[in-house]
């Protein structure tokens, strides 16, 4: 008989069944084989004892973790014999690494896994998710039988502490939250242009100089002109002792920390400390205080490689990870093109160009890392010029790089921005806290499948996993870090763990509703738009009306709303699409059992005679971010901090022909034109309005040359309104002249500008 520690329950609760007792097991990520015994539960009392095998890897850590989780519900733990235990851990070495089995009956819970330990840890996570978050020493645990193992071996999340430093305690809490959802790789982006965050004893100036900057940019780098800064010095780094503590803490939760030391680009902070490792562009190197791609890169000379190898040696001594991430992305070649040493090296090595020089650089670093028994990961740019022989590719610019690498039989971690970049907005950017841009809501993360259909089953084996990336340009606090990460990391955890055919987004929403109670109990500052109303407006051709539909991700919830009124007491229950015939602002909120669960959301719809109308543009739009083909008549105005509702044109003269729903009389045309000088977007300098009865013969009814206040220092949506005498029209033509050349004293002065319009409104 195995010698074990024990766990028994000394008191039984007589409470009535909760939601999970009634046939529900709301576990995230969804186990790959789950059977629920409806109506049967294991009741927990105020004291529990567990039996854990003595030969189990990380036995002490697992015991301590389980005790901590149970204590959150005021449940004490105490050991006893295996025969008496009601939570029993049993070694079964026929199970693969990370696999586990969990059986819960009215008498006991049994977790089986092999002695490696990870499976037991994951079984504990599933068991604890069956314990209601609000149970207080009276928990009723749903009876289940689970046989489970992960879909992917690499289940990662990345945090960027270089742009904005996060404390050791913040990282430890992030590790705890990852562990709760069975993630096993934490990639920490430690160095970049804006900061160096790890102590290297041989090179103390890396932290003395490289971890500090005088200030930080306010807002997006392309929003204010000139850029604005907060004037507040920022600094911070992890000592080697901090790193050891984080690595050990993560290891106890079966998470491996992968460090990233950026090279050859994104190196401003390092070169500010040690400029001798640059190409010597004849300028002062500084730790950057705004976000961009900078020309400061490492110069591929012998002293640089000695420096990098010494740095990597200290890093590898601190991190037992099998991988070292070396970055390799967004490396400008300007410095190398004008550097005599680089050009001589290209010639000496018989390289084609600077791209092959970067490949040679990465090859050389890889040989050194391999000599230490480790492998490199690099962003997909390391494919350019030839891939290093043993490198693992992290594919972020879509899946193309990952597909190419897999076909070459290289390991791949899929992390395309469209599904995995959780620094993007997750709720309506018009009202959301500042993010880098784009839009990645919860369900888009959940929809991701990391195995491209273009790969054969054999090639798909090289896709070892996927990762969510949380870049830190705008993540200045621990609370905001959690807001950006959750609940999207929970969706990613299910992508990583659960077989694709077993995923169900509606069921995920149901389980997330349960697990949100645990997030709330832990004080996680998660995004609450799961509990908020979303607006979708569109023209209904069949009904010849503009309709707004409201929805929420939260199951079994009530949506209440009002028109042009933020007073919650006047909200009424939403039951059908809302027809609008004029400009209206909708306000709405989500309620569960009569209690409002999230914030009150609102959206303005600029419904007018052009809304929903078909139109053509000559030339065609260069880009559309929303509602392709009808973005100019979708009823939604743009706003200045994001280009989500804008349409861009790169020609100076634009003709837009609009077919109205019917012949009517009109007297006004309105549109918005965007000024973002950093993006070379300048507002329309002339708008001509023409009308027609047949779509062939047009007559001009008005022409306006707007005046703008270019003394403003921030991106601005300029409204343009053209008024004229009431005229009959079935078709309307707008001839819009762009902003011409970018003005003197501004970015790209003298170069052609771009025109961006949001909504054409006709009254």
Task: Enumerate the predicted regions with their spans.
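Active-site neighborhood of glycoside hydrolase catalytic domains
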Residues: 288-289, 294-389, 396-404
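Solvent-exposed serine/threonine-rich low-complexity stretches and specific carbohydrate-binding patches
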Residues: 700-710
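Flexible, acidic glycine-rich loops studded with aromatic residues
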Residues: 376-391, 397-547
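Feature activates predominantly on carbohydrate-active enzymes
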Residues: 95-323, 364, 368, 467-472
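Aromatic, loop-rich ligand-recognition surfaces of beta-strand-rich domains
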Residues: 639-702, 716-763
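Short, compositionally stereotyped local motifs that mark structural "simplifiers"
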Residues: 51, 499, 503-658, 665, ...
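Contiguous, structured surface segment used for ligand recognition
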Residues: 20-154, 480, 496-518, 522
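Bacterial Sec-dependent N-terminal signal peptides
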Residues: 1-25
């Amino acid at each position: 008989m195995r010698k074990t520690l024990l766990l028994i329950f000394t008191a039984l609760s007589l409470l009535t069944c909760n939601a999970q007792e009634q046939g529900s097991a709301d576990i995230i990520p969804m186990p790959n084989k789950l059977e629920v015994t409806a109506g049967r539960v294991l009741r927990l009392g105020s004291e529990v004892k567990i039996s854990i095998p003595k030969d189990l890897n990380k036995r002490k850590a697992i015991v301590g973790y389980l005790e901590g989780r149970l204590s959150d519900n005021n449940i004490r733990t105490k050991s006893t014999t295996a025969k008496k235990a009601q939570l029993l851990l049993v070694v079964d070495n026929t199970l693969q690494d990370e696999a586990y089995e969990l059986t819960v009956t009215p008498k006991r819970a049994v977790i089986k896994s092999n002695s490696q330990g990870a499976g037991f840890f994951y079984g504990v996570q599933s068991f604890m998710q069956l314990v209601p978050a609000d149970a207080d020493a009276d928990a009723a645990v749903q009876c289940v039988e689970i046989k489970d193992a992960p879909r992917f071996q690499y289940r990662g999340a990345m945090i960027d502490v270089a742009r904005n430093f996060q404390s050791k305690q913040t990282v430890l809490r992030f590790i705890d939250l990852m562990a709760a959802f069975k993630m096993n790789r934490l990639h920490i982006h430690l160095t970049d242009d804006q900061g160096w965050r790890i102590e290297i004893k041989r090179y103390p100036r890396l932290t003395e100089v490289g971890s500090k900057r005088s200030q930080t940019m306010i807002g997006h780098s392309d929003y204010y002109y000139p850029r604005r800064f907060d004037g507040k010095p920022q600094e911070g780094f992890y000592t080697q002792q901090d790193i050891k503590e984080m690595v050990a803490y993560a290891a106890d939760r079966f998470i491996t920390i992968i460090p990233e030391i950026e090279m050859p680009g994104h190196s401003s902070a390092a070169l500010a400390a040690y400029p001798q490792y640059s190409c010597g562009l004849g300028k002062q190197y500084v730790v950057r205080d705004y976000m961009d791609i900078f020309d400061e890169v490492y110069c591929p000379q012998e002293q640089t490689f000695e420096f990098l190898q010494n740095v990597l040696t200290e890093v590898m001594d601190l991190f037992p990870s099998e991988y070292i991430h070396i970055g390799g992305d967004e490396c400008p070649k300007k410095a190398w093109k004008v550097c005599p040493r680089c050009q001589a090296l290209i010639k000496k090595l018989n390289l084609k160009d600077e791209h092959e020089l970067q490949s040679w650089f990465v090859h050389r670093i890889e040989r050194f890392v391999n000599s230490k028994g480790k492998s490199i990961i690099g962003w997909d740019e390391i494919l350019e010029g030839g891939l290093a022989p043993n490198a693992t590719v992290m594919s972020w610019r879509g899946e193309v790089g990952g597909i190419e690498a897999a076909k070459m039989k290289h390991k791949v971690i899929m992390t395309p921005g469209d599904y995995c970049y959780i620094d993007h907005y997750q709720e309506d950017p018009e009202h959301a806290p500042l993010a880098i841009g784009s839009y990645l809501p919860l369900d888009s993360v959940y929809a991701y499948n990391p195995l491209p259909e273009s790969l054969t089953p054999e090639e798909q084996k090289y896709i070892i996993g996927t990762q969510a990336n949380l870049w830190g340009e705008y993540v200045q606090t621990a609370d905001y870090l959690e807001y950006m990460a959750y609940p999207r990391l929970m969706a990613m955890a299910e992508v990583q763990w659960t077989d694709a055919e077993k995923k169900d987004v509606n069921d995920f929403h149901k389980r997330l509703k349960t697990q949100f109670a645990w997030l709330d109990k832990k004080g996680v500052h998660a995004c609450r738009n799961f509990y908020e109303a979303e607006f979708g407006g569109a023209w209904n051709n069949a009904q010849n009306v503009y309709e707004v539909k409201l929805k929420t991700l939260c199951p079994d919830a009530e949506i209440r709303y009002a028109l042009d009124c933020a007073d919650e007491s006047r909200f009424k229950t939403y039951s059908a699409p809302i027809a609008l015939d004029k400009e209206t602002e909708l306000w709405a909120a989500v309620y569960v059992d009569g209690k409002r669960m999230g914030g009150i959301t609102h959206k303005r719809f600029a419904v007018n005679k052009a809304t929903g109308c078909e139109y053509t543009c000559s030339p065609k739009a260069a880009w559309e971010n929303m509602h392709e083909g009808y973005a100019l008549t979708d009823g939604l105005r743009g706003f200045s901090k994001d280009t989500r509702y804008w349409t861009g044109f790169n020609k100076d003269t634009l003709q837009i022909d609009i077919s109205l729903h019917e012949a009517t009389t009109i007297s006004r045309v309105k549109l918005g034109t965007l000024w973002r000088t950093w993006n070379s977007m300048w507002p329309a300098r002339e708008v001509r309005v023409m009308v027609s009865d047949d779509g062939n013969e047009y007559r001009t009814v008005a022409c306006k040359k707007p005046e703008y206040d270019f003394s403003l220092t921030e991106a601005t949506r300029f409204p343009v309104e053209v008024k004229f005498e009431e005229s009959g029209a079935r078709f309307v033509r707008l001839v819009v002249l762009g902003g011409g050349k970018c003005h003197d004293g501004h970015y790209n002065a003298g170069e052609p500008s771009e025109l961006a319009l949001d909504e054409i409104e006709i009254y």
